[in-house]
Amino acid sequence: MKKLFILGLLCLSVLGGYAQDDSDDWKVGGKHYQEWVAKQTCTEACGVRFGSSYETAKEILKRKYGEPDYLETNENIIVYHYKSYGGMNFTYMSFNFQRDGAHSYMNQCVMGYECKTAEEAKDKRDAIWTKARSKYTAWSEYVDENGFKYYESGCSPLGGFGNGFIVDVVKLSEPYNGYRYFARIMYGPYNYVQEDF
C-alpha cells in the first residue's frame, strides 16, 4: 500500500510539472498563446488577404465571383450582391480599401443580409454568429442603442485584440426598397495607413 501511495505521489508530481510547463506556454508570448492568437486573427475574407492592394483584390474577386456589381470610381470599394461565402448566401458584400497616396490596402469587408423585419434581421444575425463562433473562441456580447444584441470577436491582422470583426444588426434610418434592417458581419476597418509625426 505504501508503494502504491508513493507511486501515486510520483505520478502527481510529474503531472504537476507538465501542467506547470504547459501554463508557461499560455503566458503572453508563450507557444500555446501565440498559436491561439494566430487562430483568432482575421487574415482574409473571400480568399483576399487583408492588406491586399485594390488591384490584387479585384482580380481575386473577379475569378471567384465574376464582374463586380459596383466599382467606385476612386477605387475604394468593390461591391457584389447575392454571392455565397462560407456556405452562406449574402445579399450584399463590400470590400473597402484605404489609400496612402501610393498604395492601397483592403482594410474592411462587410457581408450581410437586407431584412424587412427586426425578427428576420435577428435570425440572420444569429445564423452569421453561429457560423463565426465555430472558428473564434473568444468574444464579447453587447446590446446596442436599438436593443439588438451584437458580438465582437477575433483579432486584427495588424496585431492586438479587439476590432477583429463584429456581427450585428443595423437599423436603417430610411427604408431601402422595403428593407429596414441589415444583419452583417463586418471585418475591420483596420488602419493600414499610419500617419504620425
Model feature map: region roles:
Residues 1-4, 20:
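Positively charged n-region of N-terminal signal peptides that target proteins for export
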Residues 2, 30-33, 78-81:
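Short secondary-structure boundary micro-motifs
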Residues 4-15:
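Sec-dependent N-terminal signal peptides
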Residues 6, 91, 104-107, 177-181:
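Residues at beta-strand starts and edge strands
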Residues 20-73, 108-197:
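Non-cytosolic coordination micro-motifs
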Residues 74-119:
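Mid-chain, structured segments of secreted extracytoplasmic proteins
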